[in-house]
Amino acid sequence: MKTGNQFNTVALVGRSNTPNIAEPLATLAACVAKRGFEVVFEAETAREIGITGYPALTPAEIGARADVAVVLGGDGTMLGIGRQLAPYKTPLIGINHGRLGFITDIAAADMQALVPVILSGKFEREERALLEARIMRDGEPIYHAIAFNDVVVNRSGFSGMVELRASVDGRYMYNQRSDGLIVATPTGSTAYALSSAGPILHPQLAGIVLVPIAPHALSNRPIVLPDDSKIAIQIVGGRDVNVNFDMQSFTALELNDTIEVRRSKHTVPFLHPIGYSYYATLRKKLHWNEHASNEDDKAS
């Protein structure tokens, strides 16, 4: 638990093109400003909802000026702003206004009660890992990106299987024929990797997971690697192969292109309410323990 007020400027970020988001954002802005904090808005958010009276800043300006960012939206909104603010080490507070909400853990109905408490200095902090990747073609880097959840190499919807050659730290691992391969952070282990039968990694685990997508051989299983591993995936066969970063940006690949993936030097700080439990999140989102139980989280 971190105590002691260390925040002065609070940035608000909302999910663009989301119906009914303007009112909760305006309510949150008033709630935070009333407690003496300077409130700024991410520029696209301010433009989309038509709010005035607060500075509208780019993500880079938020990183330089704001002490914390409060994100109202779904996991995709959190992923997007998290990647942009990671170089500035700006902490994030996530309010769920989407559907699943693995990383936006505060319910919208609770934001006026919980956000001021966190901003007063009472919170639980954790650092989330990122991946950085680059595409090599003929020995030269042609594309670079970072990912919060995962780097996914996969075929297009109308092509056949791809053949990939994977190596770790310069050591050959395998060739596999499949629909693709997911390289995921612990945060990303509950995203696409989970739907492909990958394991759940606790967010504080220092690991990277490789998960095949519909492999031709059932012996091609997910594997968890140390988080200092350097992973290389070469396109050996197939056509119309793409690489996606958090499923939000992608680029087409050619035969013999290599995707190099490693843990980023940046992390994203998350601030949670006191009493936050990752296991409670899993129970709720994955519908574990569906039957009524008197076993609740107890303070240690």
Curated annotation (Swiss-Prot):
GO MF term list: ATP binding; metal ion binding; NAD binding; NAD+ kinase activity
GO BP of this protein: NAD metabolic process; NADP biosynthetic process
Keyword tags: ATP-binding, Cytoplasm, Kinase, NAD, NADP, Nucleotide-binding, Transferase
Active site, per annotation: D75
Location in or out of the cell: Cytoplasm
CC annotations in GO: cytoplasm
The protein's required cofactors: a divalent metal cation
Any Pfam family: NAD_kinase
Predominant subcellular localization, coarse grouping: cytoplasm
EC number: 2.7.1.23
Reaction(s) this enzyme catalyzes, per UniProt: NAD(+) + ATP = ADP + NADP(+) + H(+)
Annotated residues for binding of NAD(+): D75, G76, N149, D150, R177, D179, T190, A191, Y192, A193, L194, S195, A214, Q248
UniProt-listed PANTHER family: NAD KINASE
Family that this chain belongs to: Belongs to the NAD kinase family.
Job description of the protein: Involved in the regulation of the intracellular balance of NAD and NADP, and is a key enzyme in the biosynthesis of NADP. Catalyzes specifically the phosphorylation on 2'-hydroxyl of the adenosine moiety of NAD to yield NADP.
Official protein name in the record: NAD kinase
Lineage: Bacteria, Pseudomonadati, Pseudomonadota, Betaproteobacteria, Burkholderiales
